[in-house]
Amino acid sequence: MRLDQVRAALDRRLDPASRAPLAVGFSGGGDSLFLLKTVLDWARPLDRPVLALVVDHQLQPQSTAWTAEAVAKARALGAAALGLTWTDQKPRTGLPAAARRARHALLATAAREAGARVLILGHTASDLAEGVAMRAEGSSVSNPRAWAPSPVWPEGRGLFVLRPLLTLTRAEIRDALTREGETWLDDPANLDLRYARARARAAGALTPLLPVRESPPPGVFEIDPAGAIRLPRDVVPAHLAAALLCASGAERPPRGDRLARLVERLRSGARFTATLAGARIEADQAVLICRDAGEAARGGLARLDLAPGACGVWDGRWEVVAGKTALAVVALRGRTSSLPAEQRARLSAIAPAVRPSLPVLLSLDGDAPGELVLDDLQLEADGEARVRSLVPDRFKAAVGLLDQESVT
């Protein structure tokens, strides 16, 4: 077994000097059992805490008992453990995709609240191969990457997912566990042929795939404090998609024909303005990508109310923590004239296309004027509200510039 490759992946990505907990997705199944034992072996000499997170999707009658059993197993192995329950109403269609989204949201929220920066998951080479078969059936399941930002937003902000088992097959893992005398839980959903994953497994003899190679990070880009991204016109499609994703605050990047057509227009050298996936694109000598303020007419840039001390994410782009007073976060569009003269003067340094989608903080305690947020440290009038642009770190993570825990 290529166990040395698994340990090398942990060494490559994790910071041995950190004392932040390592979050591990744990179901009690074979893959996650092998993963948890391996992570514990890696973390124990470093005196680093490991937190096993067990998700109960509430899709099987026995799920509560299975969750309790998995939590007990994780604790017996030496990890802290927490059960998480998907309590939302289950959709009649698209259940696998909804369950994936809910699972990642629960895991990300719990990991962040525990102080973890990395969530470690047990996807294998077999999962890579099954994903090919599933996508051939029309599934939206993505190709697991060895290191990637959390796929849910904004719950997963600042959190990375590490998958160190992608070079091992499920059979290899189970053989190793059997030699160690271990037993594991088997989810009956894995045998339910109503689901694409089960059909892919039942097909058998899938060709294992190597993990996907990522595009090299962009050599030239600029992100200003207002959250706009500037890229060269010859930007590769993956990085263009990442810029559109981050500038718009959306959860999923654009793909397919629409992205391909935008790339072609950029390659043509023509000057143009366009919108795509909630972002505005201005192509001149370089490409300016920012939030499309017109999305306000379609429900975007919605007002965010925060109680004193509460934290929230506005429009997927700005994290705001209220101070001693309640506040609302709204878009600047249509409010410029109500700002103090000093604030209006500062707007001249910002590209006109970027201005309408900037955040404004409004005090809900009295009639204090709004505060335009122009940089990460702009404070509310009471001097306590904190505001942080999420765009820079999210873009750097999306294009592979944050490739280790120590640089996140």
UniProtKB/Swiss-Prot annotation:
Keyword set, alphabetical order: ATP-binding, Cytoplasm, Ligase, Nucleotide-binding, tRNA processing
GO biological processes: tRNA modification
E.C. numbers: 6.3.4.19
Residues binding ATP: 27-32
Subcellular location: Cytoplasm
InterPro entries assigned: Rossmann-like_a/b/a_fold, TilS/TtcA_N, tRNA_Ile_lys_synt, tRNA_Ile_lys_synt_N
Pfam assignment, any one: ATP_bind_3
Example of a GO MF term: ATP binding
Main location as per UniProt: cytoplasm
Top EC class, one word: ligase
Entry's family note: Belongs to the tRNA(Ile)-lysidine synthase family.
Protein role: Ligates lysine onto the cytidine present at position 34 of the AUA codon-specific tRNA(Ile) that contains the anticodon CAU, in an ATP-dependent manner. Cytidine is converted to lysidine, thus changing the amino acid specificity of the tRNA from methionine to isoleucine.
Name used for this protein in its record: tRNA(Ile)-lysidine synthase
Organism: Caulobacter vibrioides (strain ATCC 19089 / CIP 103742 / CB 15)
Gene: tilS
